[in-house]
């Protein structure tokens, strides 16, 4: 291809807090997907915990569908934006300057402990209160999906304004647009895609370079900045608090990342191998940024200084069937032969598959069964 445009989107980040692996603790976007795609809610009482404006949309979706109990826990103080005003108009309870420090329950979440936080959100400054709920929606911001651009040789660069890695300088004829380039608003994504697509079409001699039509989108744009908060504090230290899962696929906790730093594993690549952070089939799509932030904090560095690991193919797990094709028959698994294989064939052998090796099983004469031959 003369030009490739990547529009791979972004992943919503979960917030890290104690017991955050209980069933019905979900991403805010996942709760919205249940509501908007299937018209169902995963529970009756919702608590939304967020450090950004975007998660308010989940509360709006919930309220619009069942008009039931919703509480928004916003880690930011004095938030001024349209989504806050809309939430107040819908009589949604908002608790600013607080965060979930621990979830309670055995087989599923039944309540959360909520405590007031300092301006940075990294310290608790008061007593915790318990809020009963059966669904928790969390949002810690968005991470640009830089995986495919990384596989072209582009090194991800940390952008502190959007609190995400985004593609650096391209080394091939490739451009990233929309959310994977750090534009997380829907309108910005579409405008970016149209603009870059038209520009590349003109450069390659196909079109005039001007968009054929404009798309008018009315949406609640995020107005208040996302707070730089990845791991919510607890009354106890990371090593003593209930488990705060960062990579839920491989059970990597905030405490294990901090322990890795204490043990002297300062390189992000070493920490990845010490803890298995991002080693799962998702290649750290939800966990890497949170993990890098916790590591940076433990080392007293910035996320930009800590950096991130690169991403290997494939972007998503690939089935054996897609690789092998339709007519596999005996080609699915390679056959391995011993030096005496031809002699065995000359002596009417029946083979036994031992791994990939063809081993002689027994040597029947004409018409003999295995029992008769043996």
Placement of each model-derived feature along the sequence:
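Residues forming the flavin
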Residues: 1-339
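N- or domain-start disorder-to-order transition segments that initiate the globular core
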Residues: 333-374
């Amino acid at each position: 291809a003369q030009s490739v445009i990547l529009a791979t989107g972004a992943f919503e980040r979960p917030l890290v807090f104690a017991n955050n692996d209980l069933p019905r603790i979900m991403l805010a976007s996942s709760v919205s997907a249940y509501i908007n795609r299937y018209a169902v809610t995963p529970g009756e009482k919702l608590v939304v915990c967020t450090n950004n404006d975007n998660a308010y949309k989940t509360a709006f979706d919930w309220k619009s569908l069942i008009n039931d109990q919703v509480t928004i826990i916003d880690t930011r103080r004095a938030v001024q934006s349209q989504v806050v005003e809309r939430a107040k108009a819908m009589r949604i309870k908002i608790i600013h300057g607080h965060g979930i420090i621990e979830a309670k329950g055995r087989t599923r979440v039944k309540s959360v402990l909520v405590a007031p936080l300092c301006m940075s959100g990294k310290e608790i400054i008061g007593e915790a209160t318990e809020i009963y709920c059966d669904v928790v929606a969390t949002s810690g911001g968005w991470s640009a999906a830089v995986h495919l651009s990384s596989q072209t040789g582009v090194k991800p660069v940390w952008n502190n304004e959007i609190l995400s890695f985004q593609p650096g300088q391209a080394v091939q004829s490739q451009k990233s647009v929309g959310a994977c380039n750090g534009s997380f608003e829907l309108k910005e994504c579409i405008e970016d895609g149209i603009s870059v697509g038209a520009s590349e079409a003109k450069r390659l001699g196909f079109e005039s370079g001007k968009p054929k039509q404009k798309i008018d989108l009315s949406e609640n744009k995020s107005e208040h900045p996302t707070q730089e908060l990845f791991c919510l504090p607890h009354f106890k230290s990371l090593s003593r608090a209930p488990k705060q899962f960062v990579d839920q696929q491989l059970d990597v906790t905030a405490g294990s990342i901090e322990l890795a730093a204490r043990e002297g594993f300062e390189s992000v690549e070493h920490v990845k191998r010490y803890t298995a952070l991002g080693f799962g089939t998702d290649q750290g799509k939800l966990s890497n940024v949170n993990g890098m932030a916790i590591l940076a904090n433990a080392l007293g560095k910035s996320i930009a200084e800590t950096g991130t690991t690169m991403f290997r193919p494939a972007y998503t797990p690939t089935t054996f069937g897609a690789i092998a094709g339709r007519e596999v028959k005996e080609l699915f698994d390679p056959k391995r032969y011993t030096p005496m294989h031809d002699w065995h064939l000359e002596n009417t052998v029946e083979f036994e598959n031992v791994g990939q090796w063809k081993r002689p099983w027994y040597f029947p004469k004409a018409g003999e069964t295995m029992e008769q031959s043996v």
